[in-house]
Amino acid sequence: MNRVYNFSAGPSMLPVSVLQKAQADLLDYHGSGMSVMEMSHRSKWFDEIIQHTEAGIRKVLNVPDNYKIGFFQGGATQQFAMVPLNFMTTGTADYLVTGNFSKKAAEEAAKFGTARIAASSKDKNFTYIPDVKAIAYDPNASYIHICQNNTIFGTTYKDVPQVDGIPLVADMSSMIFSEPTDVSKYGCIYFGVQKNVAPAGMAIAIIRDDLLGKSAKGIPAEKIPTMMNYTTLLDKDSMYNTPPCWCIYMTGLVMDYLQNEVGGLEEMAKINHAKAKVLYDYLDGQDFYNNPVQPEYRSMMNVTFTSPNPDMDKKFCAAATEAGFVNLKGHRLVGGMRASIYNAMPAQGVNDLVDFMEKFRKENA
C-alpha cells in the first residue's frame, strides 16, 4: 500500500484504521448482507448506526443534555443560511469577519436581516483575530457569529465572545474534535465534516434547546423551507428525508477512533499541538519560508507559508507532490502553501514534510 501524505484542507485524510474498518464492513455490514451504502435509513441497522454516532459525538465532546445534534446535507455553506433563517429573531446579528468563510456567512445572513460586521481583521489581510473582549457588540443582536478557525488564512481564536443574553454561533469546520471544547459556551456549533471528521457530504449542528422553534424576524417559522428548518429536521431525528447515511456511519467510526485509539480530545490536543510546534518552529528558525500570521493567532490545523516568490512556490508544490506530499498549494485567495495537519495526519508526516522543506531550501536558497 503506497499512501501519500495528504495535506488537503478538505476533503482530507482519514485515519487508516477507520478506512480499514469501513473496508471490512463494506460488502456486509454486521451480518446484514448489504453495505451501509445500500441499506434503508429506516432499517434497524441504520437506526443503530445513527444512534451510535450521536452518542459518540456526545461523549467525545461532552455535549450537555440540553443540546440537540443534527445531521444535515448541504455542508457548512448551507448552514450560513440556516443560521439566520432560524435564529435572527430580532432582525439583526453580529458577525466577526476573520476570513473568507466568515465573510460568506455574513453575506448570506444579510439576505434575511442586518448582518452587522462587529469586527474584522481584513485591515491586515486576516493575519490576526480581533480582541473579542474589546468589541462593542449590539445588545439587540440575535446572536454573535464567528468562524473559529480560518482554514484559508491559518488563524484561530484563542478566546471566544461571551456576552450575557446573546448566543454564540460558531463555524468549527476546520478545528472540531482537534481539542476539548466547552460546548456550553455556544448556542450553536456547526461544521462541515470533510475536514476533520468524515468524507464530504454532510454538516453537523449542535444546538441549544432554547434556540429552536424560532425564525428570522418577518419570516414565520412555518414559512422556512422544510429542509432549512432546524426544528423540523431535529424533531424527525435528522430523518425527515433520507440522510447522508454513509457520512453518518463514517463519523461514528471516527468517534470510536478518538475514544478508543487516541484516548479522547485531551490526548488529541497534545498530539496536534506537538505536530504544529514542529512545523512552526521550523518556519520561525529560517528565512527562506515565511508564515505571515501573528504567532498568538496561529492555527493548529492549517499552517500557511510562502517561499521567496510565486514561481518558487510553484516549484515547491511540484517537487512536494513528486515526493509524496500532496495538496500543499495554498488557497487561490492567498497563494503560497498551506499544510492542513488535521487529526488524521500522523506526526511522522509533519516530520517528513519539514525534512523535505529543509532539503528544498538548501537546493534553492
Tell where the protein language model's regions lie, with residue ranges.
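Conserved PLP-binding catalytic core of the aspartate aminotransferase-like
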Residues: 289-319
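Active-site phosphate-binding strand-loop segment of PLP-dependent enzymes
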Residues: 10, 109, 121-176
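PLP-dependent aminotransferase-like
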Residues: 77-144
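Conserved active-site segment immediately N-terminal to the catalytic lysine
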Residues: 169, 183-194, 203
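PLP-dependent enzyme catalytic core of the Aspartate aminotransferase-like
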Residues: 3-4, 322, 331-365
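Active-site C-terminal subdomain of aminotransferase-like
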Residues: 15, 193-280, 294, 363-365
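A glycine-/small-polar-enriched, mobile loop at the entrance of the PLP active site in fold-type I
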Residues: 3-54
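Conserved N-terminal alpha-helix of the aminotransferase class I/II PLP-enzyme fold
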Residues: 32-79, 86, 100, 108
